[in-house]
């Protein structure tokens, strides 16, 4: 199966002004599948982080939100080094960890060489926009349910 949005993800990857990406969409439209498939096709490695497993991840985002610290901690969690340009970092269910959303600002400003994509439900992300959302520091794409062309 091929989702048409993968072409926009590829443009995002190749952009010289890339910011962390937030992939929005309703539940169960395929956000996670699309990001993992994109990572498999266009990156050497994918560091997949599911924030529904909060207990194991809260300590990473509890204090210092510097990209260097987060990358070091995620590399330990992932079990191998996270390399700029070759590793796609996927933050799934990002609405469950508001400080992970906040950290995107620092990745945009201090470490734009890292490819970070976030997936989350529209409602969950919208609930956090007023307090910690990194306005202007992220790119957005919206995934809709399968089109007829994609279905065929």
Please give the residue ranges for each predicted region.
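Phosphate-binding site recognition
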Residues: 1-152
